């Protein structure tokens, strides 16, 4: 249910953009995002920090987009958020020697430190790629092409990155079905 709720504002944004325009789509995105947070709080009693940050960014940049009737503000959001994710992952790994991916998934997975570092770095690179592709598309293609990319391209890229991560993680999983921590390679 939570994952489905994450896509509803994006789907509504896409449909509204195709039927109306950027201002209407931005307003629908902001309202749907606020409702999403309210529903999550009501149904689950809490909203994750990352979701609050993302919702705040959507509301801020969505309102700017609606007010000025200019999509570039939502385009900036994608660039800024992906850039921030990459920076946070890289600073945590190289400055603080703590791969954040391990903090997120470490309770579910037992991996060697090298694997956590590789995953963390890989996701940082992924966010940099998303940021750069977003910049390229927003500056060199039509507004409609950017909306299509935002609605489907980033999701496709995320699915591919997740599959690559899964394949990478698989090599470190225990082969006998046990949950031991001695799967070092």
Swiss-Prot record:
The chain crosses the membrane at residues 19-39, 53-73, 76-96, 118-138, 149-169. It is a multi-pass membrane protein. Keywords: Cell inner membrane, Cell membrane, Membrane, Transmembrane, Transmembrane helix. InterPro entries: YciB. It comes from the Bacteria. The keyword Transport does not apply. It holds the Pfam family IspA. One of its GO terms (cellular component) is plasma membrane. The keyword Transport does not apply. It is found in: Cell inner membrane. Belongs to the YciB family. Plays a role in cell envelope biogenesis, maintenance of cell envelope integrity and membrane homeostasis. This is Inner membrane-spanning protein YciB. The gene is yciB.
């Amino acid at each position: 249910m939570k994952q489905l709720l994450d896509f509803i504002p994006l789907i509504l944004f896409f449909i509204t953009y195709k039927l109306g325009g950027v201002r209407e789509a931005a307003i629908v995105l902001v309202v749907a995002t606020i409702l999403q947070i309210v529903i999550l709080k009501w149904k689950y009693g809490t909203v994750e920090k990352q979701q609050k940050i993302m919702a705040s960014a959507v509301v801020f940049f969505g309102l700017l987009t609606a007010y000025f009737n200019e999509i570039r503000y939502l385009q900036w959001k994608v660039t800024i958020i992906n850039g921030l994710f990459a920076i946070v992952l890289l600073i945590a790994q190289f400055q603080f020697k703590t791969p954040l991916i391990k903090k997120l998934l470490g309770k579910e997975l037992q991996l060697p430190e090298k694997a956590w570092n590789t995953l963390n770095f890989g996701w940082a690179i992924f966010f940099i790629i998303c940021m750069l592709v977003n910049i390229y598309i927003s500056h060199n293609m039509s507004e409609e092409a950017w909306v299509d990319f935002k609605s489907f391209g980033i999701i496709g890229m995320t699915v591919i990155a997740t599959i690559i991560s899964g394949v990478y993680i698989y090599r470190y999983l225990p082969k006998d079905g046990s949950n031991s921590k001695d799967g070092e390679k």
